[in-house]
């Protein structure tokens, strides 16, 4: 869940690609300044399902994000461009991080303005799969948290992601009820800890 939030924030925070397939991908991402959707997510390891979750998300470029998991456990992640709050409802705990610290690695560089980082760290290719366009990002370094990322588009809409991490886990995300470039209220990307919860600063 956190992994997906971080990678989406990473994707929608940079600006410039230099390779042909990357240029096409960047054009699609640049066209999405705001977005809302419902998601379903399955995490697998060695062909076995590890977890399943669902909820809703909203984003506003650059760097603002809301990721709310409703099932099976309620969790809310909010990023406002500077800070990131992770609210675990069942634990009655909020973790607060500087956004770049929370992202770490490549994402932090993107947010800091190192626009060429993605082409330094990933090889980007694309292919058609029926009516879908799949962009395949492969890490150039074994140290990256995500060794491979697939972004799946139906025309201009991002409808799915597949994330492959260092441990061999695959996170498969489907997005539905997608709205591109709606006007979003600022309060979506603001967070005030509820009374009585523990607040942990990192």
From Swiss-Prot:
InterPro entries: LolA/LolB/LppX, OM_lipoprot_carrier_LolA-like, OM_lipoprot_carrier_LolA_Pbac. CDD domains: LolA (cd16325). The keyword Manganese does not apply. GO terms for biological process: lipoprotein localization to outer membrane; lipoprotein transport. It is found in: Periplasm. Residues 1-18 form the signal peptide. It comes from the Bacteria. GO terms for cellular component: outer membrane-bounded periplasmic space. HAMAP family: LolA. Participates in the translocation of lipoproteins from the inner membrane to the outer membrane. Only forms a complex with a lipoprotein if the residue after the N-terminal Cys is not an aspartate (The Asp acts as a targeting signal to indicate that the lipoprotein should stay in the inner membrane). Monomer. This is Outer-membrane lipoprotein carrier protein.
């Amino acid at each position: 869940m956190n992994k997906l939030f971080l990678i989406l924030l990473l994707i929608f925070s940079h600006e410039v690609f230099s390779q042909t397939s990357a240029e096409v991908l960047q054009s699609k991402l640049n066209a999405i300044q705001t977005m809302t959707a419902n998601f379903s997510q399955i995490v697998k390891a060695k062909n076995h399902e590890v977890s399943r979750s669902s909820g809703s998300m909203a984003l506003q470029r650059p760097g603002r994000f809301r990721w709310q998991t409703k099932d099976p456990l309620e969790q809310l992640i909010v990023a406002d461009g500077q800070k990131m709050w992770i609210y675990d409802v069942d634990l009655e705990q909020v973790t607060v991080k500087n956004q770049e610290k929370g992202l770490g690695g490549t994402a932090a560089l993107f947010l800091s303005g190192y626009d060429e980082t993605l082409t330094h760290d990933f090889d980007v290719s694309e292919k058609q799969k029926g009516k879908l366009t799949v962009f395949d990002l492969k890490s150039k370094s074994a140290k990256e948290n995500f060794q491979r990322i697939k972004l799946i588009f139906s025309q201009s809409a991002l409808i799915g992601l597949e994330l492959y991490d260092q441990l061999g886990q695959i996170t498969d995300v489907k997005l539905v009820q997608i709205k591109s470039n709606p006007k979003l209220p600022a309060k979506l990307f603001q967070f005030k800890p509820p009374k009585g919860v523990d607040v942990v600063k990192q």
